Amino acid sequence: MLEVSLPENVTVVVETGGATEWQNETVDPSCLERYVYQDEELSFVDSVPSASMGEASTLADFLDFCSTNYPADHTAVIFWDHGSGSASGVSFDEIYDYDSLTLDEIYNAFASVYELSEENPPLDLVGFDACLMATVDTASMLSDVASYMVASEETEPGNGWYYTGWLGALAEDPSMDGATLGTAICDSFQEGCEIYGTDDEITLSVIDLSRISPLLVAYDNLGREALSYACADPIFFSEFGRSALQSENYGGNTEDQGYTNMVDLGDLVNNSAALFTDTGTDVLSALEDCVVYKVNGPYREKSSGLSCYYSYSGNTDDFIQYASVGASDAFRYLYSYELSGSLDEDGIAYVSEMGYGELPEIPSLAEDGSGDYPLTLNDEGYAVMELDADTANLLKGVYFQLAYMDVEDDILLYLGRDNDIDMDWENGVFTDNFRGVWGSIDGNLCYMEIVYEGDDYNLYSVPVKLNGEDYHLRVVYDYSAEEFTILGARKGIDDNGMSDRNLIQLQPGDELTTIHYASTISGDDDFTPVEIDTFTVTENTTFEETEMGDGQFLMLFEMVDLKNESVYSDPIIFTVTDGEIEAEL
């Protein structure tokens, strides 16, 4: 930013806070400070006592300060640093127990300072230089606050927006409207990420908020159609769940990484086209109309510009946090029914108006007492799991879990979870594809867990220690290139729901330690993390499949049912001797 020479009619006002320390000697973390950047000079202009950046009153006070002291014909408000989607919001304050601004708090702050109007919104643009905030719910909240919104569906890399680029464009043409400014922000962001080598998974979009109302109507109608199908037959939840698992989702969404429960709206609707015969087309049309510009990396090619909530975690507490800010009543009742099996009084009244009375019970494989599912060996020696139609219809997804067995030392070393299975959903037949190979870094076997399964690529999470700190490597397998690539290292979602925006590129000389999970074979103890191999990153460090060598390996088929609960098959033991594989049930 400080590299841009601003004209006299462009002013940038900055408020600092929320950090225990800053990467400079200028900012005092003990209070909230305000700076003004004009021409080529950054000037300190004000300070106020320390307060949480996650409080609506703190934001409102800053907005009022700007409006009073620096009135302007055109105004943009930018939120910088950590975001975590619809449920947790933005601006996590590490001084005040990581308190964050929820969507309703953001709205209340704007409403206390400005006269809000969808026909004549007070702001030209609201931007989030933060992770995961390009959601339907965020856009709904801002519909009478600003003309345009700029935000990312995915976590942003640590380099963030390229302020030199878009502020430079604004300096050259201060008359530009919000759409043009948003486009400059997107293009310069992509340029900056390409410079830093962090562009593989980027997303950034410009939303015309004057066009958001038709999308909100279409989105709620989609929820009503989904709710009607679920009330008629809860098997809908498994069918919809399969579509969600195949859709581009953001921020991790695994037990190991944590959950944001955000999925691309367009990709979800496209993957659910066979389910939503009445409303899906309207959503896609309205979505295309309001997303006026976007950029995305090669491994975020399904990004449509806005995400929505889907309960990947299956956690009721996560949902309750979201429910108060969700843009659609219908989807709120849909997920409430899916997660709890019931609806509150308002929900019952809602579905009654739709013509539904008593809700059917949601079936669950985990609760029906069916136990482990038997396997057979086919003529080629592969393990086969055959499910009847009723059982297969309850499933959202099928995976396998793999572990190494050290019988002599009574150790079971968990290697991970993948979807490399021959799946015949129509006939309920699932066949293993064990080849005696697994993912490794420079020949060091890793724990790896699939986080996205697409037509063109899969994404994996690999827990490691990077220079002594816990991280997850983001690894992609590209089907066309037939190879793995390490995209970078990022920390998971923390206990406050805050995502990590720092995607770190591995550098020669970095120290990596692989993390696996181990238990005893004979006992019923839980898996605990263990450090296995420590090695140094080189210029030639690669992730690839490698032969695991001789030994015994245990595999289970994992079935995820429509309640997001997992049930497992009987185990199969693979014994590898001199490269030859023998299976035993």
Regions found by a protein language model. Give the residues of each.
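Extracytoplasmic mature domains of secreted/periplasmic and thylakoid-lumen proteins
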Residues: 51-121
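Short beta-alpha junction loops
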Residues: 16-21, 83, 130-132, 154-156
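Membrane helical hairpin/interfacial module
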Residues: 24, 72, 83, 550-554, ...
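Loop/turn elements at helix/coil->beta-strand transitions in domains of secreted/extracellular proteins
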Residues: 7-12, 70-76, 119-125, 144-148
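Terminal, contiguous helix-loop blocks that mediate binding/assembly
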Residues: 90-128, 133-585
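N-terminal extension/subdomain marker
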Residues: 2-71
